[in-house]
Amino acid sequence: MNTALYLIDVTNRDGVQTSRILLPKLSKTMLNLYLDEMGVYQSEIGFPTLKHEINYINANLDLVKAGGIKRLHLEGWCRALPEDVELSFKNCPGLRHLNISVSTSPIMIQGKFQGRKTWKDVVESMYKSAKLAKQLGVVTLGVNAEDASRTDLDKLIEFALAAKEAGADRMRYCDTLGVDDPITIYERIKALALATKVPIEMHCHNDLGMAGAVSVAGAQGAFESNVDSYINTTINGYGERAGNCDLVSTILALKFSHALKAKIALDEHINLKTAWKIAKYASYAFNIPIPIKQPGVGANAFAHESGIHADGALKDRRSYELYDPEDVGRGEPELLETGRIITTGEYGGLKGFRHAYDKLGISFHNDSEARRILELVQYANLHTQKPLTDDELRFIANYPEIVQKILVVQP
């Protein structure tokens, strides 16, 4: 059986739950475009049950139809409740990929539900929700076991088999508190996958600094059990508390670790050369600096100072570097304009607007068309509360109707 490992990026759902951080809907859309360019399998785009997400989600589904997003699956997240599933499809009828989530550990069932639900109730609610999702047209369905790492293995097997019977395509094993270690999760996932033959999706948090190692180890356990495996990532590791498994670090580990690259077949569509672009944009959009030591994309990822290291790197970079800056899309000089600058935005006029777009090689048929795009640029600048990037300006010009829907938050 040919199995592979796929990446499901959850930046637009879990990453945006980072406390004290906001991400505009336009920025979420740009991340989906970059994830698609990177070859990532799926993006968890948000909550179809939330009113302020409806236009953004539907606009991104329109973007798929328009060919702006080519391969990336757009997946919504909701609770494993039939009423949530029903509301998701009422709000976003074009949704074809979904993950439904419920707590499975004794501490969460007791702590959250305060005696109102038992283990049997949890499984039954998940089963009914999964069946309904499939009936409503879901093509790929993931069923999430929240706090799986503190759930007994026999319970997880029961949960996964019930999900499989209901039509689920995979089970998400959530190490919600980052409590698992690589050896333990490898053993648990291998046993779970062998017992159920259900593809396993790893969702690991970084509370103990092991999210990447734990995710990869768990995926290896699934892979060795001859089922497809999935790793949830976020760009730059953003997420609740100490964050999630970092997208770029995970790809680097799977591509360049001597043992892993021989054991696990990473999705062939992954294009690592887009790493710098997506990490840099996410840092700008979230307003969170990239740590200087971040693998692949940090300022010091390819920096050498000590005598022995500098001498070795100059003679043969393989002495002290596993990969080249070019492998992650770095190495080219990035110019900073220091002379006269004409920008366009919230208070921009037609002349400055046309000048900015001329520099991008984009022209307009007439003033009427230009004024329409200018108005969207003004609203987009107000929406993001920061200067628009060149790629954002290009996107607005190419898909004005979709952008207009994204910028209207109230449905």
Residue ranges: model-predicted function:
Residues V10-R13, P48-L50, W77-L81, S101-S105, ...:
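Active-site beta-loop-alpha junctions enriched in small/polar residues
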